[in-house]
Amino acid sequence: MQLFIEYFPLLIFFIINSIAGIYWATGSLIVAAFVQIFYYKIKKEKIPAKQWIIFGLIVVFGGLTIYLQNDAFLKWKVTIINAFFAAALLVSNTFFNKNIIKEFLAESLSLPENIWSRLNLAWALFFLFCSGLNYYIAFNYDLDTWVNFKVFGLTGLMFLFSITSILFLYKYLEVEEEINDTDTINNEKTKEST
């Protein structure tokens, strides 16, 4: 359900764009973003900071797109969101010694510090790549190509990069499991001997 809620505005945007065009799709995207925030409020869930940022940019850039009847604002939104995430990861780690990726995943993963740093840098570079790629496609191809890229291309890239990250982390997870298994066996032997 959480995955559906996260991608709900994007799905609505794609469907309405194919039926009624970019400006109706943009209006629907804004409404869907409001519905998404409302859903979190009803469920009394904490709304992630990432969601507030995306919501704010959708409202501002979507509003400008509709008001000025210029789809360039909507195209810039995707570029800016990805650049913002890249900058947030890099700046927080470099200047504030705070690894955002570690903050999100530390409860479920125990990794060496250098691996957290590499993972943080990898995601920052990925978001920077997505930002540049979106800019290139948005302003060098027709609107329908960009919409398809935004909905399917970026989502697919995110999925593939997530899988790649998991595969990268897998060897560290196996080591942690072996350590936990060894600790469990040692604890059981200690109990048996007492």
From Swiss-Prot:
Primary location class: membrane
Localization, UniProt: Cell inner membrane
Assigned keywords, A-Z: Cell inner membrane, Cell membrane, Membrane, Transmembrane, Transmembrane helix
Recorded topology in the membrane: Multi-pass membrane protein
Pfam family, one: IspA
Transmembrane segments: 3-23, 47-67, 76-96, 119-139, 149-169
GO cellular component terms, semicolon-separated: plasma membrane
Function summary: Plays a role in cell envelope biogenesis, maintenance of cell envelope integrity and membrane homeostasis.
Entries under NCBIfam families matching the protein: ispZ, PRK00259.1-2, PRK00259.1-3
Family indicated by similarity: Belongs to the YciB family.
HAMAP family on file: YciB
This protein's name: Inner membrane-spanning protein YciB
Gene name, Swiss-Prot/TrEMBL: yciB
